[in-house]
């Protein structure tokens, strides 16, 4: 078990992203197609975290052409270039799966958090 923790510590990124559930973020990540490499962004609300050590992931949801799209990103992946926090959300739940049942403007509506606590992930 100690060997696993040592390997995880070596593979973690040094910089920690500072975001939380309910925040509206823009994730910029690399897409590799053959020999071509390009950057693409995905903007939405973080609706959950899965805490599994180095395999920690977060789920981002957005509405595209009236259809909900969700994407899972590993926090410590080398594919992720950066995560920009566009808006801090004020929520009282750890998982926002209830957002899946909302339609229209309510599907992306979360109150804004004014006092910011820094949470490292």
From Swiss-Prot:
Gene Ontology terms: cellular component: cytosolic large ribosomal subunit
GO biological process: translation
Keyword Ribonucleoprotein part of the UniProt annotation: yes
Annotated Gene3D superfamilies: 2.30.30.790
Keywords linked to the UniProt accession: Ribonucleoprotein, Ribosomal protein
Record bears the keyword Ribosomal protein: yes
Transmembrane stretches, start-end: none
InterPro entries (UniProt xref): Ribosomal_bL19, Ribosomal_bL19_CS, Ribosomal_bL19_sf, Translation_prot_SH3-like_sf
Functional summary from the UniProt entry: This protein is located at the 30S-50S ribosomal subunit interface and may play a role in the structure and function of the aminoacyl-tRNA binding site.
Record family assignment: Belongs to the bacterial ribosomal protein bL19 family.
Protein name: Large ribosomal subunit protein bL19
Gene (UniProt): rplS
